[in-house]
Curated annotation (Swiss-Prot):
The keyword Cytoplasm applies. It is found in: Cytoplasm. GO terms for cellular component: cytoplasm. PANTHER family: HTH-TYPE TRANSCRIPTIONAL ACTIVATOR AMPR, HTH-TYPE TRANSCRIPTIONAL REGULATOR. Its main location: cytoplasm. This is HTH-type transcriptional activator AmpR.
Amino acid sequence: MTRSYLPLNSLRAFEAAARHLSFTHAAIELNVTHSAISQHVKTLEQHLNCQLFVRVSRGLMLTTEGENLLPVLNDSFDRIAGMLDRFANHRAQEKLKIGVVGTFATGVLFSQLEDFRRGYPHIDLQLSTHNNRVDPAAEGLDYTIRYGGGAWHGTEAEFLCHAPLAPLCTPDIAASLHSPADILRFTLLRSYRRDEWTAWMQAAGEHPPSPTHRVMVFDSSVTMLEAAQAGVGIAIAPVDMFTHLLASERIVQPFATQIELGSYWLTRLQSRAETPAMREFSRWLVEKMKK
């Protein structure tokens, strides 16, 4: 038999049906109908001029010819699949450099990285964290994930998620807070953005802290929450990025009032042309954030 006459679809149908001893299970595996499997097997039997299955009370049984053919097909299809996997795994690696603000990295991205690497093994993802003040051109970054209003000079920005801010503190401190005004009895922990506590206190219907109030300033919300867990003071932070701490009850949100001064964005310089790897990462991350 010459290669030009190999009935490949019929051979696939027979191999699946023979492994399962079931036309129904073969149809499910190959995503075709039961009748399609039956017709392919019939075509192969006519082509070979022999019977490959016999029906018995329990279902199907292979004939001697079927038993001889099955291991040959198993081996052939396994070798083909193995070679295709080798091609896929040796696809040229595409480097992708991402700078991500630390809070988003720990709150969202790190837990999803294994999923990305399984789905895109050809992309060499190189991550660096920053405190939201970053120079993408100087650092050679393809994308940066930043917190803010979405408008940075010379930059395209794609929305990822909202970032509501609220006070977070230890359960012991929270137990002593009877109204938002009581927060001012403690050291206030904040980022380098000066307006966070003022905006939150006003949203809660209270006077803002005085210019001389005890304040500790952090360049990382992750570090700030470490201080809050140690009882140093009360932090104002993006609550959705610290759900793991809230779930553990090491940190609590003492009041429901939240404010929003910015969101998280996936950004790239307008001068940076998108590569296939960049587009794949962007689609993957945006879809993840919709779930």
